[in-house]
Amino acid sequence: MNQITGGIRQGKSALPDSITGGADMDWYPLWNSLRIAALSCIIVFFVGIFAAYYVAKLPRLLKGILDVLFTLPMVLPPTVCGYFLLILLGSKRPLGIFLARFGIQFAMTWYGGIAASSVVAFPLMYRTVRGAFESFDSSLAYSGQTLGLSNTYIFWRIRMPVCRQGILAGLVLAFARALGEYGATSMLIGYVPGRTATISTTVYQLWRTNNEVEAFRWVMINIAISAVILLIVNMLERKNKKAGGV
């Protein structure tokens, strides 16, 4: 594996050294993947919730149009999403040139991965939360209105707690999608050791250079993380069924 300057190293790991490579393994791709996924989830959490809330209240025709638009990144190949992001945010594009004046550059930077991961993870958050909101008992909101409660209070103190299991499930799925993102990320930020390397791009680069042992280690780490995420999703689903909620 290429030496990654400035990477975060750990002397010990919960996994065996045969998998992790011990203290000599560079952990930057893991750290970078986790921070990109976490920051992406913060974005899709707020955008997904408010998009789902307002779309659910729209007329059927407009709702259908926006639903297709918001869900499109989920069915498009990730490389196509990355291509559109390059067209939009590339350093030679109008928006990219404008952002560069403020020192903001998405192409070939780690935070460009946030943009790519947010785009591909958003549909999962949006659709899951929209389903939770559509299953919400509207009589609860009407009761709150008759008591003089504001729409803001009803949203945050009634609707959100009732739909929390669906929201959490959507957030976990979005995190998993962002963590495993490869196509759009590789198109926008590429693979620069110590700067833009993620788990997915690192696995590909290691495989391409015939370093199968290191690639296998990263694959096993990714599988372990994904298994934990799936366990969390299943746990949330069981809690949701027991509560008889959304």
Feature names for model-found ranges:
Residues 39-70, 83-85, 132-134, 140-141, ...:
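Transmembrane-helix boundary motif in ABC transporter permease subunits
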